Amino acid sequence: NDRSSNKNRGSVLSIYMIVLYGSMALGMFFLNFNSPLNFEPFILVSLFMSISLIPILLTKRKAPTFKKITGMSLKELYDISPLGMVGSLLYGTTQSALFSLLAVYAASMNFSIFEISIVTFLLAISGAVAQWPIGMLSDSFDRRLVIIYSTFGAALFGLFAILAGGQMYLPGELATTKNWFYISVVLFSFCSLPMFAIIFAHTNDFIPKEKFVAAGAGLQFAFGLGAMGGPFLCSIFMDLVGNNGYFIFLIFFHCAIGFFAIHRMKVRKTKDNPDSQFTPLPQTITPLGIELSPITEHIDEPYSEKVQKMLKRKGVAFRKKETEIPENTENLKDK
């Protein structure tokens, strides 16, 4: 956040999510190296966590410095970005259920351990690949539109996954291979997993820089609240409806995010990008016009003597600092 602007924040956050989901995808295959009932996989996880600290400890780049860090209540965060708060809460519910119960769902569909690792790998790697293009789209268009299309796209491909899962167990030649189910999961993940980064970027579009930390904490808190209840609610729904209740649960919450985003687009119009400094100016412009242009900044440092002489020869007047003796500019006015 410290090194990004509203023009590229979606792309920057996408890189972070690519690393996250890419590493998760690789971790899925460790299920095949040893039984989860043994202690060795947990030692391996502890080892990787320790190794992950090394780049942080060795980096020379300083942590972001904010001139002033101010707090923000959850109510204030909701007032600034209702879609950010509600979207984080609902998405936390879906993502926790998605990753926690996917293996349970696949096992109930008689998938082997290797096939389960394939499904979870495809889910994570597809989400990693999707981060960059969808993040760039969110930087080019209204982020709420990207959220709407992504959520309803995920709901559609979730429905395809239900149909593909049912087709696998039809009798005779009517049955299909598991490849169609894999494709449905990949497309579902492609639409769903970039969601939180876009919600995060959308919220920061309306928040001053000194409140980024507080806003991020609030969004993570809302995400965590949803994540606590997601697996529990989804498992109850699967008991009531059956195995297909897994994707029905995900479809319902994705549609809820999409409909709420549509509602917010009707309530709040698109916010102009505060980082954009475009101002219509003529091709030839006077010095006064340059001062009026918002892309030029006032420089407090005095000009060097060489530059001052050059400007005076060209008849250009310049202001001196208030602490200096004001210069008589009558002759310059005559010029």
Predicted regions and their residues:
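Cytoplasmic helix-loop-helix junction between adjacent transmembrane helices
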Residues: 1-18
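C-terminal membrane-cytosol helix-exit motif in multi-pass small-molecule transporters
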Residues: 32, 46-65, 259-265
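Structural signature of the two symmetry-related core transmembrane helices
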Residues: 145-160, 251
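A membrane-interface helix-boundary motif in multi-pass transporters
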Residues: 33-47, 236-254
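Helix-to-loop junctions at the C-terminal end of transmembrane segments
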Residues: 35, 130-142, 238-239
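Intracellular juxtamembrane helix-capping segments at the cytosolic ends
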Residues: 1-4, 193-207
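Intrinsic disorder in cytosolic terminal tails and internal cytosolic loops
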Residues: 66-70, 264-335
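C-terminal ends and interior cores of transmembrane alpha-helices
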Residues: 153-173
